[in-house]
Amino acid sequence: MTNDRVQDEIRHALGVRPQIDPATEIARRVEFLVDYVLTTGVRGLVLGISGGQDSTLAGRLCQLAVEDLRRRGAEAEFWAVRLPHHVQNDEADAQDALSFIAADHELAINIGAATDATAEQYEKATGEQITDFGKGNVKARMRMIAQFELAGEKKALVVGTDHAAEAVTGFFTKFGDGAADVIPLAGLNKRQGRELLRHLGAPDHLIVKVPTADLLDDEPGQTDESSLGLSYDQIDDFLEGKEIEPAAASALIEKYRRSEHKRRTPVAPTDTWWIRH
């Protein structure tokens, strides 16, 4: 199968539209959240806010959704949660994001002590120090534990920030930031997310902020693009069906194939999707 055909299949599988209307997409995704909250009978939404593009956008959509729900007579609230590991270097951006989102409730749960305790117990049990990469994944999973803890107490849903540019590369922690009840940004690539933020009136410095997972102690602020070896422009072009450098296209296709397990529920003996033909 040619790369062009695989590219088209991936784009369709992830639900990416080459062109979008920001106002329409915002309305569609807010309505999706409203409908799902009403269907599940929960009382609200919970989302971790980092100060990056994705959580800023998802957070504003969540607040718009619960306001819409209340206008319809439903009980619904939104909890925006800061989840720093000790001290976050870009805390000012996180606070700016919270101001823009204007959530019903803001709170902070510091995951530093819990993450460090897990690392200490791992070293005690194995005699080995956990790698920086491994600890980074623990941070992501600890954040999700905290969000589900809050959501369980508030009878709410956990909102994830996964979008097409992350999904195609598998650039998320399995059962960490990849774990959520609902993902309203699905099908959007990075540049489309920026379009929605501009339409919503987000601060410019949050819209153009260089994306970083910020999970590594040894390399704080390492950019997504550095980790991926690809630019988001290349990823977005690929997802929109545009031609990109053959080497970049092949790299993306391989990342997509290798990360398929992250986009699936746990594999069972009856599953066949994982078998390479």
Q: Can you annotate each of these PLM segments?
A:
Residues 58, 66-70, 127-132, 178-184, ...:
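Short, structured secondary-structure boundary patches
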Residues 2-169:
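ATP-dependent adenylation/nucleotidyltransferase module used to activate substrates
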Residues 77, 103, 135, 143, ...:
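Catalytic subdomain that performs nucleotidyl-dependent activation
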Residues 242-277:
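Intrinsic disorder and flexible/low-complexity segments
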